[in-house]
Amino acid sequence: MTGSIEHPLGEQHLAGCLALSRAANWNQNEADWRLMLATGHGWGITLLDGTLAASTLVLPYQTFAWISMVLVLPEHRRKGYATHLLRVALADLRNRALTPILDATPAGREVYRQEGFRDTWSFKRLQLEKGVRTLFPEKGPDSALAWEKVLRLDREAFGASREPLLRNLATRLPRAAFFTEVGFVLGREGREALQLGPLVARDEDAAIGLLSQALRTIAPPLYVDAVDHAPRLQEWLTKQGFVSQRPFTRMVHGAGRAPGNEKLVYLVAGPELG
């Protein structure tokens, strides 16, 4: 990679990281990047003129880790930057004995398969555009977060504790954070839109109840990443005016299975967070 330098990512690279998100039309804002850099670590490739051309992050979660933000500026693609940083991340996780996991777009899925990842389950990003009229039920859960129960349920669903992440998200969009005895939902603000997720619940009815409550507190534009194993939830979202934006596939490196219990997950936190 003549004419470029590989280096660890830090807060001094925030402007370049945000430029990568904008170029890819992703929703991360500065708070997202600060969260990911604080809870994980990453690498970048910077050109000799100081431009951050590519990035990759890893977010460790006990026995596994999320590979995230594999981004390259459009004008510097097809130079091997993404593959190189992905392999740097894989080597780092191999040394730490952590199983790599990621959420792939259709464009990245084949690349990741060639690097040893395999499909597990899938979800779709749905968006609600500004100005769309929504009609949500009048009744729903109305409980403050009970952290002990939230963390226990999330650990069962996700497969590891991610308390720092959840507590951070609870401060980002507190009016949309709700808890019942059978589930919880959180959200955050983003560069392009608000985003709801994660939403973890014991069943689909509980998930729809939580989501309807959260939706009454916020206005579009809005993103949700809804799992494909809950077709009734996706149908309900479509009836509220949400439209499909893009699919994702959750992939695990090697022969392992995805951790946790995906049947409890209804909205993921986002492909960058898990």
Residue ranges and their predicted role:
Residues M1-L35, T39, T46, T51, ...:
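Short amphipathic alpha-helix that is part of the acyltransferase structural core
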Residues V72, R78-A91, Q114, E204-R216, ...:
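Conserved acetyl-CoA-binding loop-helix of GNAT-fold acetyltransferases
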Residues L86, D92-T105, I218-D228, F248:
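Conserved GNAT acetyl-CoA-binding A-motif
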Residues V185-T238:
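Glycine/small-residue-rich hydrophobic helix-like segments
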Residues A104, E110, E115-L135, P198-V200, ...:
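Active-site/acyl-donor-binding loops of N-acyltransferases
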Residues E115-Q195, D205-A206:
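Amide-forming acyltransferase catalytic core, primarily the GNAT-like/NAT-type
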Residues L14-L73, S161-R202:
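A conserved beta-strand-loop-helix scaffold within acyl/acetyltransferase catalytic domains
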